Amino acid sequence: MTRVLLLGGTAEGRALAKELHPHVEIVSSLAGRVPNPALPIGPVRIGGFGGVEGLRGWLREERIDAVVDATHPFAVTITAHAAQVCGELGLPYLVLARPPWDPGTAIIAVSDIEAADVVAEQGYSRVFLTTGRSGIAAFANSDAWFLIRVVTAPDGTALPRRHKLVLSRGPYGYHDEFALLREQRIDALVTKNSGGKMTRAKLDAAAALGISVVMIARPLLPAGVAAVDSVHRAAMWVAGLPSR
């Protein structure tokens, strides 16, 4: 039976594991950064691999035949490592990346730092920040007030002087997002172009309220990497792998 490492932690990763089970031997791997994560069907490992060398050794030891990368679109480190190691070992490697959002009239930034510069340049005063823990520090010196929504508390991270922290996990509905933006008198939304339906509602609510959007563009995938944008296409790719 084909043995596949599924780099997950996303709804797409869980859906793919469910679709492939029990026809393919799937080992899902989660980064372990979120407490009590939703677990996929089948065997799961949690935690990092120890860089390129650690991942290479693990793939060899576990006799993995192929790797499907269904991590978050901004999980650039593990994607770069997986692409490199699979290339070196000659293992089939596929990225399952949910379709990005259409930015529409959003101001496009290429990094958290650039997004913080846009907030300052545009003079936004009440900002809804949904870039995740890793992006908060870029806004630490901003004069604006921030509503910061994250899954877990950003321990040890520099925070903006004026802010409100909300610990919450999606999915979020349109009406709830609309009410939140209006009640908090938000004049700008800063978000990453994560794509997908689970957190799309904030963009629709912002558009309905005429709220400005600053969207951080997705990082490019490593050169030459094969990618699909649906669970079905990823399952078809796995089904086409040669059997042992």
From Swiss-Prot:
Task: State the pathway, as annotated in the record.
Answer: Cofactor biosynthesis; adenosylcobalamin biosynthesis; cob(II)yrinate a,c-diamide from precorrin-2 (aerobic route): step 6/10
Position of the signal peptide: none
Query: Which GO BP annotation is one of this protein's?
Result: cobalamin biosynthetic process
Its keywords, alphabetically, are:
Cobalamin biosynthesis, NADP, Oxidoreductase
* First-level EC class: oxidoreductase
Entry annotated with the keyword Glycoprotein: no
Among InterPro entries, the record links this protein to: Precorrin-6x_reduct (IPR003723)
NCBIfam families (UniProt xref): precor6x_red, PRK08057.1-2
Q: What is this protein called?
A: Precorrin-6A reductase
**Species classification:** Bacteria, Bacillati, Actinomycetota, Actinomycetes, Mycobacteriales
